[in-house]
Amino acid sequence: LNLPIIYTEQYPKGLGPTVKCLRQKLIDNKSKKIEKTTFSAFDNEEFKTYMTQINKKQIIIIGVESHICVLQTTIDLLENDKQVYVVEECVGSRKLENADMGINRMLKNGASLINFEMIFFELIRDAKNQFFKKLSSKFVK
């Protein structure tokens, strides 16, 4: 779909890298990796610079922890005039109640809660799209 993908790793030297199966898919898609120690990715200069370079108004966000890094990044993106879409089944926390609180706070601050299928069909727009058959077979049964 030719969407820019940025993924951040929170202090990988201490916490470890992104899990191997996901990391390999991100590498295969030529995603931009940014290591950070800040909880909000927006407090990382490399992240801010890259966001300026790609110049996108709408941001789809996934990750962990919903109530820490995802929350702080979402709020900062919203405060910087971005439209943020949080993918419900792609965010989480160690405790369910923390994830729920994080999601609720993101929504109260102006983020939109969406799911993976919503993203897919909104981006594809038409069953004739070249990506529809290839990608829809992975989750539409």
Each language-model region and where it sits:
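A short, N-terminal amphipathic alpha-helix
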Residues: 1-4
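Alpha-helical substrate-recognition element adjacent to the catalytic core
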Residues: 7
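Active-site anion-handling motifs in enzyme catalytic cores
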Residues: 10
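Active-site-adjacent betaalpha module
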Residues: 13-141
